[in-house]
Amino acid sequence: MNTKHDTAAEHHAAKRHWLNSHEAGYHKAMGNRQVQMIAIGGAIGTGLFLGAGARLQMAGPALALVYLVCGIFSFFILRALGELVLHRPSSGSFVSYAREFLGEKAAYVAGWMYFVNWAMTGIVDITAVALYMHYWGAFGDVPQWVFALGALAIVGTMNMIGVKWFAEMEFWFALVKVLAIIAFLVVGTIFLGSGKPLDGNATGFHLITDNGGFFPHGLLPALVLVQGVVFAFASIELVGTAAGECKDPESMVPKAINSVIWRIGLFYVGSVVLLVLLLPWTAYQAGQSPFVTFFSKLGVPYIGSVMNIVVLTAALSSLNSGLYSTGRILRSMSMGGSAPKFMSKMSRHHVPYAGILATLAVYVVGVFLNYLVPSQVFEIVLNVASLGIIASWGFIVVCQMRLRKAIKEGKAAKVSFRMPGAPFTSWLTLLFLFSVLVLMAFDYPNGTYTIGSIPLLAVLLVAGWFGVRKRVHAIHSTAPTLRK
């Protein structure tokens, strides 16, 4: 019995050794401040700056509770990822962990679903950059494609010349977003404490009770909003990919992850609570940033331009992150056979340039298609991409559960950074992700069509697997550390 147990442990150790060999070539150049900002930057997107106005209209003050619930489960997902990172840091992130604990088929599904997500998100980000630039009249005559290609050229170049440049750019992008929220929190808190009226209304908690209470439209609209709000945290998993190029992931990653939960609480929940204490929630409108609404009431000049800079930065940050992560994920998939062989190539700057160039090519094609296809079709495709995020988060949690099983069986060493409350919180998080899919199905028409597309996605993935399985089997049969 012991011999069989020892053989299983040795085989798993050999598999980890083979997976670690996939990390060869990367330059571990990221410092603590960069990893910290990548973690929080991934949790703050344009959803807070632009989308909060429409969501306040839909749910009122209850939006704060929705952000809190989604933030808690985002934290659980990050802690699950952190446990995996401490087990084995990898630039392949959850794709590499899926390969280790679930097999190559799971790595194939996880990787391509994640790529589809970033491909669609990136196209939207590039288009958004062009639209944000047109906000300023001076650029009104410049064609949108010029700004789109310009943004691609800048972000693509930074990603190609080295991880240090990506990390530095992402640090400053994230810092702009953080400083914008801090500025609102400081000014808003001071104004609230002064007791002065704003736009003819006294500030304070009575603005909630006098306008329908905490759930002005009832519980159901707030519940349905969960399926939209959860995607505001759609880049949190980036810290797992970055861990493979950190100077000291064992100390940096836990610090970065643990800081996310209180920052989500402060930035998301704190901002919404402050917004509804300063003005009636009915004062915020869809299509306008609630922060612009507040500062406009104060008479602050050029606030529209300032906020446009912030959302422009957020779009560039997302584009930057997408290129970085897809380059690493595609290389990890290629090493296992789930992606074309050329995508495993590295440059002399320690960058997986082939995967990045492939993503850039998709972005360029997508930008031009965006101007040709109907907007509703494009919106549905983007919603389908959201399934990639749910799938990625699901794989992270399942891999964490399999890691615990491997530790229990003596196949893997214990890690110091463990997901709190597991396995209960692991199952609860999976249930939450499933509930998001159910809520999406009730969001007619786009959400319903998105869930309805799952069988089609499954057929495409199965067809793709038949296209790569010969190479997958060849790689796995010849890897010396995997032969029993």
State where each predicted segment sits.
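Membrane-interface loop-to-helix entry segments
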Residues: Q144-A202, A234, I257-I261, L382-F395, ...
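Hydrophobic alpha-helical segments of multi-pass membrane transport proteins
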Residues: A180-F184, L330, N383-A413, L428-V436, ...
